[in-house]
């Protein structure tokens, strides 16, 4: 069974570059304080790294 990580959007997407918004939408984060549970894969880790200043991560 793969590991899961919880990602929460803690800062708004307003006035952020389009690339950051697309990454957040790709992870399923659309509203402030929304939490999603994702599989811990290198792809997801890369997405989290791009928007690390906007999200909170719990393993």
From Swiss-Prot:
A Gene Ontology molecular function term of the record: structural constituent of ribosome
**Domain of life according to the entry:** Bacteria
Cellular component terms (Gene Ontology): cytosolic large ribosomal subunit
GO biological processes: translation
Q: Tell me which UniProt keywords the record has, alphabetically.
A: Ribonucleoprotein, Ribosomal protein
Q: Does the keyword Transcription regulation apply?
A: no
Record keyword Ribosomal protein present: yes
Instruction: Supply the InterPro entries for this chain.
Output: Ribo_uL30_ferredoxin-like_sf, Ribosomal_uL30_bac-type, Ribosomal_uL30_ferredoxin-like
Which Gene3D superfamilies did the record assign? Answer: Ribosomal protein L30, ferredoxin-like fold domain
Q: Which Pfam families does the UniProt record give?
A: Ribosomal_L30
Q: Which family does it belong to?
A: Belongs to the universal ribosomal protein uL30 family.
**NCBIfam families xref list:** rpmD_bact
Assembly and partners are described as:
Part of the 50S ribosomal subunit.
- What is the recorded name of this protein? Large ribosomal subunit protein uL30
Please tell me the species this chain comes from: Desulfatibacillum aliphaticivorans
Mind giving the lineage of the organism this protein is from? Bacteria, Pseudomonadati, Thermodesulfobacteriota, Desulfobacteria, Desulfobacterales
